[in-house]
Curated annotation (Swiss-Prot):
Pfam family, one: Acetate_kinase
UniProt record similarity statement: Belongs to the acetokinase family.
Residue sites binding Mg(2+) per the record: 7, 391
One Gene Ontology molecular-function label: magnesium ion binding
Keyword annotations: ATP-binding, Cytoplasm, Kinase, Magnesium, Metal-binding, Nucleotide-binding, Transferase
Active-site annotation: 155
Binding site for ATP: 14, 215-219, 289-291, 337-341
The name this protein goes by in its record: Acetate kinase
SUPFAM superfamilies the UniProt entry points to: Actin-like ATPase domain
Keyword Transcription on entry: no
Length: 405
């Protein structure tokens, strides 16, 4: 079975073709700058994995007016006869779609139908930057692949098991009943994937695993997992809540927004832009790439050093709070770009946790690997793992399960 994975955003389409017989990636690519009329840089690429160590990448510059043109460009690359990843597009057996927000009703992967489209549409106010692009991608993909099932996999689904005392805000209750304002979370596909992978490494049924999963990238989130199911997560109604991120503030005093409006004359739109695009690490030190921040800190930039301190202190606070929520923890899992590759952030995030059962092995923590590896000592009561996430494979597995059900 070959499955095409599509992550359709507002101005881009990420795609990956996976052969589920051995879960190998046949091709992966990106179409970006959709809707721009003055494209001068290469905005379409596809990397082919022909079953050997050699990869071949094609990059082109092409104006892409809309998602239909973008999808056609991706399909044209995938069907390139010279690359030999498949003989014909009819070899694609199913299409899996990543959906950021499914609201309260979409709690598991489902085959796309009118009801699913309606629910994704209804969740647009909760994910205005993402869900419209997802809908465009689904519509175009269904037109181009008419004979195969299309399956939606929701980032919010993993968090539907979070109990009311953890997902309801202390606001007038009618804001929840009438407007569905509650904690939804994000990165659920990633958190679920590393949860299942960690269970294998611990050699325990996932239903017996209590974990703290730490997804650190330009967007970052954490989850408390009890018996393989999420009982809390750091992101909220939107991906703005929680950890300090690349350009997002994470947790702040809500009254700051009223202060900015009343005293600085900032509009709601300006405040929203600032909190999402100009805050976080970038707001503190002017940079949001951890490599640049570490280099600046090493060169004596005090604000860069402060940014890392604020970031990792927030992570450590969440680890402590999730330990209290879970009672007993089997492992802490770091994943995503920063979580997998930044030993400094990992080490600082685990400082002062020895008395709580977390003992870091500095030598193990300093290594790099594309495979999962443990970074805690044998004496550590709580194991600490670095597990590379693979959201596309997770979506492919979910899609296969739905199609074969």
């Amino acid at each position: 079975m070959k499955i095409l994975i599509i992550n359709s955003g507002s101005s881009s389409i990420k795609f990956q073709l996976i052969d589920m017989s051995d879960e190998s990636v046949l091709a992966s690519g990106l179409v970006e700058r959709i809707g721009e009329t003055d494209t001068t840089e290469k905005n379409i690429n596809c990397t082919f994995h022909p079953g050997t160590d050699k990869k071949h990448k094609i990059e082109i510059c092409q104006t892409v007016a809309d998602h239909r043109q973008g999808m056609l460009a991706a399909i044209e690359l995938l069907g390139d006869k010279e690359q030999a990843v498949m003989s014909d597009l009819s070899e694609i057996d199913a299409v899996g779609h990543r959906i950021v927000h499914g609201g309260e009703t979409m709690y598991q992967p489902v085959v796309v139908d009118e009801k699913v489209i309606a629910e994704i549409t209804a969740a647009i106010p909760l994910a205005p930057l993402h869900n419209p692009g997802h809908l465009d991608g689904i519509k175009v993909a269904q037109e181009l692949f008419t004979e195969v099932p299309h399956v939606t996999v929701f980032d919010t689904a993993f968090f539907q098991t979070i109990p009311p005392h953890a997902h309801i805000y202390a606001l007038p209750y009618e804001l929840y009943t009438k407007h569905r304002i509650r904690r939804y979370g994000a990165h659920g596909t990633s958190h679920k994937f590393v949860t299942n992978e960690c269970a294998k490494l611990l050699e325990k049924p996932v239903e017996e695993c209590n974990l703290i999963t730490v997804h650190l990238g330009n967007g970052s989130s954490m989850s408390a997992v009890e018996g393989g199911k999420a009982i809390d997560t750091s992101m909220g109604v939107t991906p703005l809540e929680g950890l300090v991120m690349g350009t997002r503030s994470g947790d702040i005093d809500p009254a700051i927004m009223a202060f900015l409006n009343r005293n600085l004359g900032m509009s709601i739109e300006e405040i929203d832009h600032m909190l999402n695009k100009e805050s976080g690490l970038k707001g503190i030190c002017g940079m949001n790439d951890m490599r640049d921040i570490h280099a600046a800190a090493d060169a004596g930039n005090e604000l860069a050093e402060l940014a890392v301190g604020i970031q990792t202190y927030r992570i450590r606070k969440y680890i402590g709070s999730y330990m209290a929520a879970l009672g007993q923890v089997d492992a802490i899992v770091f994943t995503a770009g920063i979580g997998e590759n930044d030993d400094i952030v990992r080490a600082k995030s685990l400082e002062k946790l020895e008395n709580l059962g977390v003992i870091l092995d500095k030598k193990l923590n300093a290594q790099r690997s594309k495979e999962p590896f443990c970074i805690s000592t044998p004496e550590s009561k709580i194991q600490v793992w670095v597990i590379p996430t693979n959201e596309e494979l997770a979506i492919a597995r979910e899609t296969k399960a739905v199609v074969n059900a």
